[in-house]
C-alpha cells in the first residue's frame, strides 16, 4: 500500500484569472478544504494596514488539479488553500503570495490564518525555498506581536533550529542575537 506521506496543496492562477488548487503527493487523496482569499486593506479605519479575508469557498479537492470557479478573477494578495485548517496537508504559497506574506505577515488580522502562513513559511525553509536567515528575521520582526504564547514558543523553537542547523556558521551569532 502506498498511503504514507503528506499531501502538499498550493494555489495556482493564470492570466485569465482561473483559480486552481494543485495537489502534489505520491498518493492523491481527497481533501475537504476552505480556500480563503485575503487582501491588504490600507484604509481599515485604524490608521494602519490590515490583511483581511475577502472571500472564502469550501470545496473538495479530489485530484491533482481542482479548479475553483467561484474564485476566478477575484483580486487578492494572499490565497490560503487550507484556510481554517480543515485538512491535514502542507500548504504552499505562490511566489507572489510568499513575498506578500514576508512583507505583511504581522498585518494578517486572523490569528489562525497567520499561524497557517507561519507554517507554510517554515516548510519553505525546510524545503530550501526560503532562506533560513529570512525566516529568522521574520520571527524577530513579527513573533513578539503574536497573541498566543504557544505560537510564539513554536516560532522561537523553529527560528532557533534554523540558526543552529540551516544558516552559515558565520551568521549564527547574528541570528541568535536577533532572537
Short names for language-model regions:
Residues 1-179:
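Non-catalytic accessory/interaction domains
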